Amino acid sequence: MKRIFLKLAVALVTFTIGVSATAIYWLYRMEDVELPAVATLDTRPSCFPGLSVRVLKSTAQTEFFPAVALSENAWSRSFLNGWYSRQLEAMNELPLAALEDEDESYRFLWLRTFHQPVAIHVWRTGVRHFMVVKRLNGQGGYEAGTFDLYWARSLSENDWNAFMMHLEHTEFWLMPTEKTSAMFDGAQWIMEGYREGRYHVVDRQSPDPGAYADAGMYLLRQSGLLADMPAKDVY
């Protein structure tokens, strides 16, 4: 009986060695196989540069809306430029083209006539992404007020890519800056963008549900501001 077990053990060891040797032999005989690359999201907008204008990036840049007509009407253009610029200045914001350390940046200015002004700024520096949220205690249609909320955090690559997809769906870089609206009260949804030396801004008043509104709402959700905000105040 012991001899039988001994023979079986020897046979098993011999078989195992043979299989291992064969596997190693064929492993070294195999040609190198190129593995498929991991799929990554191409975040360059398909509609870029679209209607954007070339603006030199410089810390000396002082105009928030350079070379951009916020309205075809001269009086409206001057009024809107002054209104929006005063709100941004109250938030200690700078023109996007003046931020030399940012490779790509976007700013959403949310001005509700009777509610607190909000600015959400997101940007990319290399492979890192960031968000800054500012809210004042005044009213978007009147005096800006002073800081009520101010915080910053990093954004994950997934969060950044999700926002890029929202901009892609709305064809942000191809959207006209102005769209005539007959509203007297409401909210201005102003989205600025700067990348590769080009600048674009879109201004809509209480936009209808759709891709552009979704892009703004995405930033508002990421900011956390909607968590304790009544639905009637979101317009």
Model-derived segments and their meaning:
Residues 20-235:
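Function-determining sites in protein domains
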Residues 1-18:
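N-terminal Sec-pathway targeting helices
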